[in-house]
Amino acid sequence: MSVIRIKTNATVVAVLPASEDQADYPSTFFEGGNEIRLYVNKEEKLDVLRQYVYMGLVEKNCKIQHVNAYLYAVLKGERELLEADWDSFGHKIGIRGEKIGPFNLVRVEDIPDGLPDGKLNAEVSAEDDAWLPLFLLGLYRVGRASETAYRTLLMESLIKQCKAIKSDWVSPVTATHKYFDVWGNDGNYLKIVACVDMFYNHFKKSIKATFRWGTIVSRFKDCAALATLGHVVKITGLTIEEVFTWVLQTEVAEELVKMMKPGQEIDNSSSYMPYLIDMGISAKSPYSTIKNPSFHFWGQLVAALCRSKRALNARQPDEIDSMSISNASLLMAYALGSSPDIEQQFSTGDTYRKPPKEASYLVSEEPKSRSVVEWIAWYSDVDNKPTDDMLMMAKRVAGTISGPRDNSVGKWIKQTYG
């Protein structure tokens, strides 16, 4: 984009510094047959790795290289039978009738440099392979939790999972330990986590699917804007197409269009797509709230005004057109609340028949349907401003909110309409 300097008639190119990385769509990674690569030490014996990891947990200095090598060694033999061909983004994972394992999802390459030294413990045996992988994968979920009470709750749940396998087991780790938090910075550990979750998400009936307790947070990581869309569909009872028609604000629409880029396998439950971050497919998710702040705020505000408690805790993004988005959200929530989709579904013989709808020439009269066209026409007739009834509805919602989190949608509603 350029402008003209009036005094000199010179052309000036108007640019701003690049403030952030561009989002990477998952399909882009696989162009040209690119493969996901996992690097682990494949040479050390499982018995030795098991002891290294166990003693590392006991002494609170467990090395991530040992963890990765152990998880690969103990899980590489797991096999499940494919009932149908499995492929994603043109990459053939397996064919019908084939037995495959978690690491068929990636190309595994050996790290030839060897492993750091570790300590041995002869009392650790193959029996510990029943709980140790679950525990190591579970620490990923615990390590992502920053809030103390929630972290403690997760650790207690993980310990219960392991005790269900070995009743006399005593955890060598507590929620107060932090050394394993940094494992989430290791790309190979993240790929192992993603492989396990993607594999057992596909084979949900497997006895080892319990390993997903810790890995499930890898699925749709940094895809919160997609979760927002799903929540709006659920809380409003509209179809996804109907939700789209209620998007009345430009920035929200533009972000939604970017999220809906074709060919990304969003609706394929067995795709690599949900693991775009931990598999290393995308450095920056196009489905995050950071990339879609206006849509995220719009969707969560609609849900909150429709009395969703979960939406109240959603983060309030900075530097967006909050008031314009708020008005659009309020109109949608008010319209849905004023025209509930209620009609007789079953009958013992008597059925209510709706009388024919009488034509009305008064646009200022509130619509009785959920038609977005009728509501936009009505809103235009009231000068495109929230009416007293709309504001009263929002005020009632604000009145139900107590102690909202700072910088949350609930806080915004309380301050704006309370």
From Swiss-Prot:
Among InterPro entries, the record links this protein to: Rhabdo_ncapsid, Rhabdovirus_ncapsid_C, Rhabdovirus_ncapsid_N, Rhabdovirus_nucleoprotein-like
**Per its record, what are the GO molecular function terms?**
RNA binding
Compartments reported by the entry: Virion; Host cytoplasm
Q: Which GO terms describe its cellular component?
A: helical viral capsid; host cell cytoplasm; ribonucleoprotein complex; viral nucleocapsid
**Keyword Cell membrane applies:** no
Note the superkingdom of the native organism: Viruses
Matches recorded under Pfam families: Rhabdo_ncap
Q: Which cysteines are joined by disulfide bonds?
A: none
Keywords in alphabetical order, please. Answer: Capsid protein, Helical capsid protein, Host cytoplasm, Ribonucleoprotein, RNA-binding, Viral nucleoprotein, Viral RNA replication, Virion
Q: How does it assemble?
A: Homomultimerizes to form the nucleocapsid. Binds to viral genomic RNA. N in nucleocapsid binds the P protein and thereby positions the polymerase on the template. Interaction of N(0) with the P protein prevents the uncontrolled aggregation of N(0).
Summarize the protein's role. Answer: Encapsidates the genome, protecting it from nucleases. The encapsidated genomic RNA is termed the NC and serves as template for transcription and replication. Nucleocapsid assembly is concomitant with replication, therefore viral replication depends on the intracellular concentration of free N, termed N(0). All replicative products are resistant to nucleases.
Please report the name of this protein according to its UniProt entry.
Nucleoprotein
The species this protein belongs to is Spring viremia of carp virus
